Amino acid sequence: MQLDEAAREPCSQLLYGYFYSRNQLSRCDKYRQMLSQAARERKLAAIERGELKRHDVLLPHGLSPAELLPWFAALSDHKGLKRAWLARRQVHYLQAVPAYALVVEFAALRWVSDSLLQQIANSLPDGVSCLVLNRTAKRRDRKSVV
């Protein structure tokens, strides 16, 4: 039987607390190490998902039309949005949580600030990890928000 990755950290916290309350400190070590490892993985995942590099592997998003509806709804609220591209990113850390890259393009005369990209990222469906990038004519002017 395989342990569900999403349950690993909460279960480790419960067992650590249980053994600690019983003063069985030698049994606590295993769960303390598991909690430390989970915290390290979360930190590495945040770093990995916070930027898009040239060698990163992008895959089809794999979402059904019904699963895309919240994405469409979130993006339709932003005036001047011309196009958007969504891809799933292949990640090394926390693979159970899908990581996406969303590239948005606005009308030519629209100024795109970091706060606007952050608003777009915040309006996306809950429970997803998505890097939002602005596509501009000049490569060096691209901005990104996690």
Task: State where each predicted segment sits.
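Acidic-aromatic/histidine active-site loop/patch
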Residues: 140
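Conserved small/polar residues in nucleotide/adenosyl-binding loops
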Residues: 145
